[in-house]
């Protein structure tokens, strides 16, 4: 099953970027490699229930099983011992990646209260984009009655663009609503 955004990339976005940046080869055109959704859950060190609910929510949002991250070393100030669960993440590629990106652009971001667009300043020098969301309720898969606490997440869109200008052009063509 090919995703709408995947088809859009090959039929419309790729030719536009070839024309804009005058690439000589189709393989030079930047593309989205993967999307990583990360959620730090520091309270998981004290309560396993928090970690399980966070993992379940991430599974619902992404459509894929998440991975538990563990602390590398003990930090007394944060009351964390070594190898204690401190977060969850999931890496999306292929059709699931395009499906998530489509839902993020068309369903989740417009549901943010007083949404003005996302900042174009969050690109690194390699054309990857990072976005922080403050709550999980913007995703239609999450029901308000079934969450125990509002928790945010970090979303990293990894591209193979050579610089931030190419990455911005790619994500604008996909329809990400950047502030003007």
UniProtKB/Swiss-Prot annotation:
GO biological process, one term: translation
CC annotations in GO: chloroplast; ribonucleoprotein complex; ribosome
InterPro entries assigned to the protein according to its UniProt record, in alphabetical order: Ribosomal_uL5, Ribosomal_uL5_bac-type, Ribosomal_uL5_C, Ribosomal_uL5_CS, Ribosomal_uL5_dom_sf, Ribosomal_uL5_N
UniProt-listed SUPFAM superfamilies: RL5-like
Keywords carried by this UniProt record: Chloroplast, Plastid, Ribonucleoprotein, Ribosomal protein, RNA-binding, rRNA-binding
GO molecular function list: rRNA binding; structural constituent of ribosome
Compartments reported by the entry: Plastid, Chloroplast
A Pfam short name: Ribosomal_L5
Primary subcellular site in the record, as a coarse category: plastid
UniProt keyword Isomerase present: no
Subunit structure: Part of the 50S ribosomal subunit; contacts the 5S rRNA.
HAMAP family per record: Ribosomal_uL5_B (MF_01333_B)
Functional description taken from the UniProt entry: Binds 5S rRNA, forms part of the central protuberance of the 50S subunit.
Family listed: Belongs to the universal ribosomal protein uL5 family.
NCBIfam families in alphabetical order: PRK00010.1
PANTHER family assigned to the protein according to its UniProt record, in alphabetical order: 60S RIBOSOMAL PROTEIN L11-RELATED
Protein's name in the database: Large ribosomal subunit protein uL5c
């Amino acid at each position: 099953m090919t995703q709408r955004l995947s088809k859009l990339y090959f039929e419309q976005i790729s030719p536009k970027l070839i024309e804009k940046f005058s690439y000589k080869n189709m393989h030079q055109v930047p593309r989205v490699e993967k999307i990583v959704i990360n959620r730090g859950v520091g309270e998981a060190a004290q309560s396993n229930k928090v970690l399980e609910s966070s993992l379940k929510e991430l599974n619902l949002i992404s459509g894929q099983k998440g991975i538990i991250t563990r602390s590398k070393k003990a930090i007394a100030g944060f009351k964390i011992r070594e190898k204690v669960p401190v977060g969850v993440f999931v890496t999306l590629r292929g059709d699931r990646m395009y499906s998530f990106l489509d839902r993020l652009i068309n369903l989740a971001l417009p549901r943010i209260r007083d949404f003005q667009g996302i900042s174009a300043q969050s690109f690194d020098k390699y054309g990857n984009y990072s976005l922080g969301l403050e709550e999980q309720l913007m995703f239609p898969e999450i029901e308000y009655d079934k969450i125990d606490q509002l928790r945010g997440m970090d979303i990293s869109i990894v591209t193979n663009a050579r610089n931030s200008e190419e990455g911005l052009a790619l994500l604008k063509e996909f329809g990400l609503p950047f502030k003007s």
